[in-house]
Amino acid sequence: MVAHWAEYNDPQYVPFLLEAEPEVVQLGFYGAHFWSLAHTSSYNGYPSHLPVQGHKECGAWFEEKNKLLHTKGMKVVGHFNVEFLVGDPDSPEGPRGFFKFYRDHWDEKELGPKPVADPLTMLEKNADGTPISQAGYGIGGMKEYWACLRNPDWQKVMKAWVKRGVDRGIDGYIANYFYRHNCLCEHCQRDFRAYLKERFKAEELKTQFAIENLDQHKFTEIVSWHDPKESTPLRREMLRFSQISNKQVFDEVFIKYGRSLKKDLIAAQWNHIGNLHQISGDERCLLPADMWGKDEDYLWYSTGGAACYTDLAKGDLGEGTLQARYIRGMFQDKPFTLGKYESTRIRVAISELAANGGAPMGFYTRFKDPLARQVITRYYQFLKRYDEIYRGNSSYSEATLAYPRTAVFRGDLGPVEAFRTEGKKLLDRHVLFDVVSDEVPGGAKPQAEKPSRFDAPTTVRVSASRPAKGNEIDFHFVNYNREEPPKDAAGNPSPGSGIAEEKPMAVKEISADVIIPSGSEVLGIEFITPEQPEARVIEFTAAQGRVKFKLPEFLVYGVVRVKLKP
């Protein structure tokens, strides 16, 4: 897949897509960014960089691109900002941004009747009833507001926008800005009381939270993400409520309603995980396991600035491997991507995801840089050529590492740091392991008594998978070694300025001694890498349920295909 928020109207963009041939293109804006900004003079600036001004004109542009990409066999997923509103309810020139759209540009022939006359009633509220707002981005000199997802009128607005995008030929949506703030509106007060009533008995509310009469209790805060050091049991219930109710709204708008319009509508969320940040980050950190990704087609998790540079001398590979394995385990081998904000190490970003069940890649497929474009195309065509080993594959492991979600539920993040530490040790030792949540009974399995062994440097990561058709084990090797760009004056590692600074250093002489399933017979072994057009046959020895082989030299990504007798 590819995703772009800028320069997607460049003349080179569509030719690049035709070369790389991604299956999914995240293109276009159909939520609050579009409706807040398309009619303004800020239409072509951050965040959405809309190609033309005007709702009708810009909508027609997206519709034309949807039709074009469909003729090339690509699915188009639109970005859908669910609540972040840019505008001013009033100014010397009247309403601006979203509020101007709602008053003057809501076309009932296009969107149906307005859910409510006054848009201020749909906003998140402070304790005194005023709208929560900020002047953070300063887009067009306007403020930012947030709609309350729990407000039924706002859900009608989102549904109107969902329908309009479906009419324009979109294949699905990725919901972003999927937050809840410290909203104290009547809907949040009511729904949080209902949540507590279902979860706790009256006596428990008294003893645990000092709530004497829930029906009459008015909360002075209902927080969502917050500083873990300032967390309390009640605040974590507020966060859990926020995440559950957000998921319920997502399901209502995109799953139930969206798929009533288009039964195969692709539905995804854009979330944030950083370096496994919890309580202060991760939109699903307290979400119950049975709701985690339920009915969603793929996930986007942003690692932000946590994994877009290397400091090899300190063992920092700038990787998202551990995050990827956590997401894969929670999402049960369904597709996901990591938004690494990586514009330099393009090969590694693609390889890391491919090796761990992900869909390469997130942001910053730099199609205007000739070298980046060449590399992206080469690696995407490699994935297409060997589609059978990636599509619908499942992880193949010899051990599990438990992720301490139950500790997070208690507000104890010490075990998360221990998880990071242990995870890195296992990765450095090249142990084939999955990540499972400790909230799932029986999810863990003991490590094999004599596990597979890989003689490889610690700058290489190893994983394994089974293709959907079976009869094969695929071992993935990702090499992070490189010539690093100079650090800054303070000694901080540099993320680099583009693919010319990726500078990977090939790895040589990796040997392996791996376990194969009991009773299996190896028919042959092949080695593939994006830098070579054809597979290479590898010599091996097999005895007593184990296979030994050596890898040829490769640059960043290599896969060993161990083919088994059916």
Where do the language-model regions lie?
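Amphipathic, non-transmembrane alpha-helical secondary structure
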Residues: 10-19, 63, 67, 155-167, ...
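Acidic/aromatic-lined carbohydrate-recognition and catalytic surfaces
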Residues: 19-168, 180-186, 196
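Catalytic domains of carbohydrate-active enzymes, especially glycoside hydrolases
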Residues: 9-42, 165-172, 295-299, 350, ...
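Polysaccharide-binding and catalytic clefts of secreted carbohydrate-active enzymes
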Residues: 107-318
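Flexible loop residues that form catalytic
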Residues: 29-30, 170, 178, 183, ...
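An acidic-aromatic substrate-binding cleft motif
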Residues: 1-7, 401
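Carbohydrate-binding surfaces of carbohydrate-active enzymes
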Residues: 76, 217-230, 243-283, 292-566
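Acidic (Asp/Glu)-rich catalytic clusters
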Residues: 15-21, 34, 65-73, 289-294, ...
